UniProtKB/Swiss-Prot annotation:
Principal subcellular localization: mitochondrion
Subunit structure as annotated in this protein's UniProt entry: Component of the ATP synthase complex composed at least of ATP5F1A/subunit alpha, ATP5F1B/subunit beta, ATP5MC1/subunit c (homooctomer), MT-ATP6/subunit a, MT-ATP8/subunit 8, ATP5ME/subunit e, ATP5MF/subunit f, ATP5MG/subunit g, ATP5MK/subunit k, ATP5MJ/subunit j, ATP5F1C/subunit gamma, ATP5F1D/subunit delta, ATP5F1E/subunit epsilon, ATP5PF/subunit F6, ATP5PB/subunit b, ATP5PD/subunit d, ATP5PO/subunit OSCP.
PANTHER family per the UniProt record, alphabetical: ATP SYNTHASE SUBUNIT A
Keywords: ATP synthesis, CF(0), Hydrogen ion transport, Ion transport, Membrane, Mitochondrion, Mitochondrion inner membrane, Transmembrane, Transmembrane helix, Transport
InterPro entries to which the protein is assigned, alphabetical: ATP_synth_F0_asu, ATP_synth_F0_asu_AS, ATP_synth_F0_asu_bact/mt, F0_ATP_A_sf
Organism: Petromyzon marinus (Sea lamprey)
Family membership noted in the UniProt record: Belongs to the ATPase A chain family.
GO BP of this protein: proton motive force-driven ATP synthesis; proton transmembrane transport
TM stretches of this protein: 12-32, 69-89, 98-118, 137-157, 181-201, 202-222
Name the UniProt record assigns to this protein: ATP synthase F(0) complex subunit a
């Protein structure tokens, strides 16, 4: 039974060839693309205002230079969101339940913010490793702690996404198996079916929220390491 539960997280193969790349390429078919037509599709008309409002909410705290990250961040959010939603379909594979893929997304994006921060503003970037007003005796210890916390950030991004999706898929698997086994008992099967329906709605919300949280934390790291709004750079009186 344990193997059956976790079998949904194994990478699918056909004739010995991995098919995970198909699952990762599938969201590209659902992304909005610009067309030369004057009349936009309903999907484009619905999705564009939503993405625009999310981008404004995430990038308005930054200055004009930080807005160049909007495209890659929104594309990454849509990529994660589509994979999460497609993974809720029956008999499908969810690549975002694999820690290797999530770390492959989190580490390069986080590392880009850190490296650019060290390149553009090395003094401000290194200042985050030592809080202001720290006693001299605690300086070495705090530098080590802040450095460790800095390198834990991409791990937290990947593990958070993996853990939330894996827990939800396992719970849906257990409830669906219980519903199938309890079919002869009508009253219990109805209750478990309603529970499965509510759990599916919850997982839809989790799929959307986790994609948004992933990019939200990335923009916060970007704002901290690279771009600071002009209002916070006012000279002292």
């Amino acid at each position: 039974m344990t193997l059956d539960i976790f079998d949904q997280f194994t990478s699918p193969t056909m004739f010995g060839l991995p098919l995970a790349w198909l699952a990762m390429l599938a969201p590209s078919l659902m992304l909005v693309s610009q067309t030369p037509k004057f009349i936009k599709s309903r999907y484009h008309t619905l999705l564009t205002p939503i993405l625009t409002s999310i981008a404004k909410q995430l990038f308005l705290p930054m200055n004009q230079q930080g807005h160049k990250w909007a495209l890659i961040c929104m594309a990454s959010m849509m990529f994660i969101l589509m994979i999460n939603l497609l993974g809720l379909l029956p008999y499908t594979y969810t690549p975002t339940t694999q820690l290797s893929m999530n770390m492959g997304l989190a580490v390069p994006l986080w590392l880009a913010t850190v490296l650019i921060g060290l390149q553009k503003k090395p003094t401000e970037a290194l200042a985050h490793l030592l809080p202001e007003g720290t006693p001299a005796a605690l300086i070495p210890m705090l530098i080590i702690i802040e450095t460790i916390s800095l390198f834990i950030r991409p791990i937290a991004l990947g593990v958070r996404l993996t853990a939330n999706l894996t827990a939800g898929h396992l719970l849906m698997q257990l409830v669906s198996m219980t519903t199938f086994v309890m079919i002869p008992v009508i009253s219990i099967s109805i209750i478990t079916s309603l529970l499965l329906l509510l759990l599916t709605i919850l997982e839809l919300a989790v799929a959307v929220i986790q994609a948004y949280v992933f990019i939200l934390l990335l923009t916060l790291y970007l704002q901290e390491n690279v771009y600071v709004p002009p209002s916070s750079c006012m000279p002292h009186g």
